[in-house]
Amino acid sequence: MCGTRMSGKPIVCLLVATFLCSCSVAKSPGQELLTAAGKPAEGPLDVFLREPLFDMQVVFDGGNDVREPYLAIAVDGTLLAVRNYKNQLRRSEDGGRTWGDTIDVPIAHSDSNMIVDENAGDIMSVRMWDGTDKLFRSKDHGKTWTEEETVIQPNELMKQLENTGAKKRVTKGEQDKSGTYYLHANAGEAGVALRHGQHKGRLLVSATFRPHAKAHPSDREPADAIFSCALFSDDGGATWQVSDFFPEGYTEEAALVELHDGRIYYNSRSHSGYYDKAFARELRPDENVRREAWSNDGGQTWENLNIVHVLPDGGGYGRGYGMKGGLTRLPVKGRDVLIYSNADTAGGDRKKMTVWASFDGAETWPVKRLVYAPHGAYSSLVAGRPGTASEGLIYLFFEGGPNGAYTAMQVARFSLSWILAGERTGNGDVPEWVLR
């Protein structure tokens, strides 16, 4: 793991200057952890190490606007694949072998996320960019959705900014955005329901905070800082609290997972702080690799910032920043097997969609495997649930097709044993308990 630990204190100065410029997953003592479907929340590793399997199929196609894939898995194992730009969803009830008809849904369009509440079985999407904060909820594994009001509480730094006169931006169409800020969930990975530790049952999802202190800056003037953060709910989605900001600015489109000891691992895209992209690369030579941090308090604060040189931040076509990547933890008892996805072309074209595996909770990433060599951009990952048709498989939903990165979305299904036949990265070793 590469990087330097950084203090979060400069964030206060940067943001203020810019503008002054418990529910729980069902479990009783001694009993197995179960979801609302009565299925185990976690199981053995062996099911992911069966005979290597790989297949792939197109789920959405169209012109040049097949953008922003979101993937979630309901407690019964139903897969939900969302095409964000078109507010469309397709479901698979047989582990990704076949996909149902396209459903028009209200949960997408440039501000989307999905969170599966394993205790209640509901699937939720929090929308906070356009007008009043809203929550969309499905009680039938994504077939239908209802709209609810929800409350999103600001964190302490946001309150400080509001005291200086900053106001929440309420419509995306505002031309004069100076002196405003907004939260959004654009291009973040699916949220999680915490299973372990003091905050078990908490719903947690990544988000982004964007301030607008001034009009569009000049090419060599810093843009307004963008900060990854998270939203968490301890009441099933009725109210949400904004976490502290990620310990580095110019970050967004992030992903998070819970580790087996209850810690939260946060992995974020890096976003350019300058409109002059050559200037951005000169000042931030590590622009095209991922950032990571951890939380020991259920996602409220973040610490131990690191720059992850082994994980590319995808292709930016020379623009000095990365793109949305996928992240999931396999539901394995007592182990932290993580899978990450992105284009293996840091800073170059958006091609070579690849997956990486970690067996020690993101300390090392010793193996990777190419999934799709042609065009490939944003991606999303989930792992199959024990006791369902999805069990033992990993699912990658990504932008990409033979005619371009944004002309199709495909779902690849594969086993961990398939990844293990890939390329060693030199960043740590695959442990014996995996290879046995």
Tell me the role of every PLM-derived stretch.
Residues 1-8:
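N-terminal secretory signal peptides that target proteins for export/translocation
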Residues 7, 22-24:
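Serine residues within intrinsically disordered or low-complexity segments
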Residues 25-436:
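Asp-box/BNR beta-propeller blade signature and adjacent active/binding-site loops
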Residues 12-22:
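Bacterial N-terminal signal peptides
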Residues 10-11, 32:
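Intrinsically disordered low-complexity regions specifically enriched for long asparagine
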